[in-house]
C-alpha cells in the first residue's frame, strides 16, 4: 500500500504578546508512506496462533519558510503483533502482545503561535519530530456455558509508552499556552478486570457483576516543571432482573467508582478522590397484552459536586397497542431535577460537566400502522 499527502500551515497572530518568538507560521511539508503487510496464522485442535509483522517506510519533507529551514526524515517502522487463543470445552484462554512506533506530524514543529480558542494559544518548543514507542501485553481466561447460562471472564493487561517529547500547559492569567518540549517521558498502565453473569430458569432471573482496577504512572509538564504522578481507579457494578409474576418484571442495577491522582513527592497539587455511584430500579407491568406500564427511579451521586450531590431522576410511561394505532404517554423527570453535574479525572486535571435539564414534562406519542 502506498500513500502520499501534502500539507501547509500559514498563520498570523495579532494582539497577543509573543515575546521573542514569532507570531507567524509559514510551514509546508509532505509525507510518503509505503507499507508491506504480513500476517501468519496457525490453527489446530482448539489452538489458534496469529503473528503479524507489517513494515512501513515513512518519509517526510519539511520546509519552514519563517526559519528558512529545510529538512527530510526517513523512518523504517516495524509493528509486530502476536495473539494466541486456546479453547477446551466451555473454557478459553487467550494472550496477546504488540509493539508499535509512530512518528509525529511535521506540522507539529511549527515555530510561531497558533490561537486555538479565545483563551488558548499553542506553540511547539521542539526542533525534531516526536517519536512514540508503545508496547502492550494482555492475558485472559473465560468460561461460557449456554446450558447453565453461566458466563465469566477475568483479564489483565499492561501498557508501556515512551515519547521523546513531553506536553504541558503554561498559564498566563486567564490564558493558557500549550507547549511541547524535547524531553523524554514514560508512562505505564496496569489493569485487572472481571465480568460474570448467571441466568436462572425459575422466575426468569439473571444476575451480573463486574469490576475493574487500573493503575498508571506518568509525567505532566506544568509551568515549566515536570511532575511525576500516578493514578488509580476502582469500579464495581452489579445488575439483577427477576420476573416473579407473569405480568411483573423488576430490574435493579447499580455501581460505584473511586478515582485518585497524586503527584510523587510534591504537595503543589493536593490529592482529591472522585467518588461516584448510581442505583436504578425499573418496574415493568404487563397489565394486558396491549397495555404496558413502566416506572423507573435513579440516583446519581458524586462527592465533588458543589450542590445536589444526589441527583434523583424518575420516569413513568404507559404504552397501549391497538390494531392500527400505538399510543404512548411519558411523564419525564418526575422529580423535576433541573441540573446534573458529572466530575471526572484525566491525569492531574479534574473536569466538571454540568447539564441544564428540561423541567418536569409529559409527552404523548401516536404511531399509525399503514399496513
Where are these regions (language model features)?
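Exposed, low-structure sequence patches enriched in small/polar residues
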Residues: 1-371
Amino acid at each position: 500500500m502506498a500513500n502520499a499527502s501534502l500539507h501547509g500551515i500559514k498563520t498570523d497572530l495579532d494582539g497577543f504578546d509573543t515575546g521573542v518568538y514569532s507570531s507567524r507560521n509559514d510551514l509546508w511539508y509532505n509525507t510518503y508512506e509505503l507499507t508491506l503487510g504480513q500476517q501468519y496464522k496457525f490453527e489446530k485442535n482448539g489452538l489458534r496462533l496469529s503473528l503479524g509483522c507489517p513494515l512501513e517506510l515513512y518519509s517526510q519533507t519539511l520546509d519552514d519558510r519563517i526559519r528558512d529551514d529545510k529538512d527530510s526524515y526517513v523512518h523504517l517502522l516495524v509493528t509486530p503483533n502476536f495473539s494466541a487463543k486456546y479453547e477446551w470445552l466451555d473454557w478459553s484462554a487467550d494472550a496477546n502482545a504488540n509493539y508499535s512506533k509512530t512518528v509525529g506530524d511535521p506540522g507539529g514543529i511549527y515555530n510561531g503561535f497558533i490561537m486555538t480558542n479565545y483563551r488558548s494559544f499553542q506553540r511547539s518548543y521542539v526542533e525534531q519530530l516526536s517519536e512514540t514507542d508503545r508496547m502492550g501485553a494482555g492475558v485472559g481466561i473465560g468460561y461460557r456455558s449456554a446450558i447453565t447460562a453461566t458466563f465469566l471472564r477475568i483479564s489483565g493487561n499492561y501498557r508501556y509508552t515512551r515519547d521523546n517529547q513531553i506536553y504541558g500547559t503554561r498559564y498566563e492569567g486567564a490564558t493558557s499556552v500549550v507547549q511541547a518540549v524535547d524531553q523524554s517521558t514514560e508512562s505505564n498502565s496496569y489493569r485487572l478486570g472481571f465480568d460474570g453473569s448467571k441466568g436462572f430458569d425459575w422466575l426468569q432471573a439473571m444476575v451480573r457483576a463486574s469490576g475493574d482496577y487500573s493503575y498508571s504512572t506518568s509525567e505532566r509538564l506544568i509551568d515549566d516543571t515536570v511532575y511525576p504522578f500516578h493514578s488509580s481507579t476502582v469500579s464495581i457494578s452489579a445488575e439483577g432482573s427477576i420476573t416473579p409474576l407473569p405480568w411483573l418484571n423488576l430490574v435493579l442495577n447499580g455501581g460505584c467508582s473511586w478515582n485518585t491522582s497524586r503527584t510523587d513527592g510534591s504537595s503543589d497539587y493536593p490529592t482529591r478522590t472522585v467518588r461516584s455511584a448510581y442505583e436504578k430500579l425499573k418496574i415493568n407491568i404487563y397489565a394486558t397484552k396491549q397495555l404496558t406500564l413502566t416506572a423507573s427511579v435513579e440516583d446519581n451521586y458524586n462527592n465533588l459536586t458543589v450542590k445536589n450531590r444526589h441527583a434523583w431522576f424518575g420516569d413513568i410511561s404507559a404504552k397501549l397497542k391497538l390494531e392500527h394505532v400505538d399510543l404512548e404517554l411519558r411523564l419525564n423527570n418526575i422529580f423535576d431535577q433541573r441540573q446534573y453535574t458529572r466530575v471526572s479525572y484525566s491525569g492531574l486535571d479534574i473536569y466538571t460537566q454540568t447539564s441544564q435539564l428540561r423541567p418536569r414534562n409529559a409527552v404523548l406519542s401516536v404511531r399509525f400502522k399503514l399496513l
